[in-house]
Curated annotation (Swiss-Prot):
Residues the entry annotates as binding NADP(+): G166, A167, S168, S191, I232
Reaction(s) the record says it catalyses: (6R)-5,10-methylene-5,6,7,8-tetrahydrofolate + NADP(+) = (6R)-5,10-methenyltetrahydrofolate + NADPH; (6R)-5,10-methenyltetrahydrofolate + H2O = (6R)-10-formyltetrahydrofolate + H(+)
Nucleotidyltransferase keyword on record: no
Biochemical pathway: One-carbon metabolism; tetrahydrofolate interconversion
Name the UniProt record assigns to this protein: Bifunctional protein FolD 1
Keyword field: Amino-acid biosynthesis, Histidine biosynthesis, Hydrolase, Methionine biosynthesis, Multifunctional enzyme, NADP, One-carbon metabolism, Oxidoreductase, Purine biosynthesis
InterPro entries documented for this protein: Aminoacid_DH-like_N_sf (IPR046346), NAD(P)-bd_dom_sf (IPR036291), THF_DH/CycHdrlase (IPR000672), THF_DH/CycHdrlase_cat_dom (IPR020630), THF_DH/CycHdrlase_CS (IPR020867), THF_DH/CycHdrlase_NAD-bd_dom (IPR020631)
Amino acid sequence: MSAQILDGKAIALELRDSIQKEVEAQVANGKKPPGLAVILVGEDPASQVYVKNKKIACEKAGFNDVSMVLPAETSQAELLAKIDELNTRDDVHGIIVQLPVPDHIDPEEIIERIDPKKDVDGFHPYNMGRLATRLPELAPCTPHGVMTMLAKTGIPLRGLNAVVVGASNIVGVPMALELLNERATVTVCHSATKDLPQKVAEADLVVVGVGIPNMVKGDWIKDGAIVIDVGINRLDDGSLCGDVEYDVAKEKASWITPVPGGVGPMTIATLLQNTLQAAYGVKA
C-alpha cells in the first residue's frame, strides 16, 4: 500500500484564492485592506526567508504589508514600544513577531504585549485559552492549518486515537487542543515520554513537530494511519526532509503529508485567514 498525499500546497492555494476574493469584495465596499505587520529582529537567514514568503503572500492576497526589520541589538523596551504603536494603528489588523528573537529579548513578554485581537499567530495566552475552552478566535496557524487540510480532504477525526509528538506552544499543545475539540482521543508525547515507538504504533493519526530529521521511523507507523509531518529540516547535502522517515512511512500510511509542500503552505494560508478575520470578522 502506498499512501495518498495530503497536498497542502493545492489546498492552501484554494484558500488563498478565497481570501483574495473576500478582500476584493470588502475593499469594493469601502473597507481598508487587511494590514499585516511582521516584525523581524536581526538577520537570521531562515527567518528572513519566512518573512519574505509572508510578504509575497500578503501582496498576492491584496493585503497591506507593514513588515519591518529591526536591528539585532534592538532592546526589549524598543520592541515593546513598536508593538504598542502597531496596536493603536487602525490600518494594522494583525501583528506577528518572527521567532526566534535574539537571546536578550523575552519572547513571552513580547507575545503578551500584542493586542489579542491582532495576535494573528494565535500565541497570546488569551487566544490559547480560547482554544483550550473550545471558544477559538485566532488559533495558532500551523495546527489550525493542519485541521483545515484534514477537513478539506474529508478525513473524519471523531474517535481516532491521535498521537502528537512534540509539546511546544507553537505546534504540539495547540495541535492537541484542536484534535480534542474534534473529539479525537489525544496523547501528547515529549522528551520524557517512555516507549515512543509503541505510542506511535498505536496511533490512527500521528502529528510530528520536533525539528529532528527523520526522528519518527517509518516502521513505527501503524498500517493505514494518517501521518502529518510538521517538521522541515535542511540536511548537510542541502536537501529538505521532515521529522518522519517519509519513504518507509508512505508505504504504511493511508494519508501522508510531503515535505516540502504539506503543512508549510497551510501555515501561511492560515496566517492570511487569521488576518482577514481580525480585519473583517469573517473567514474565507
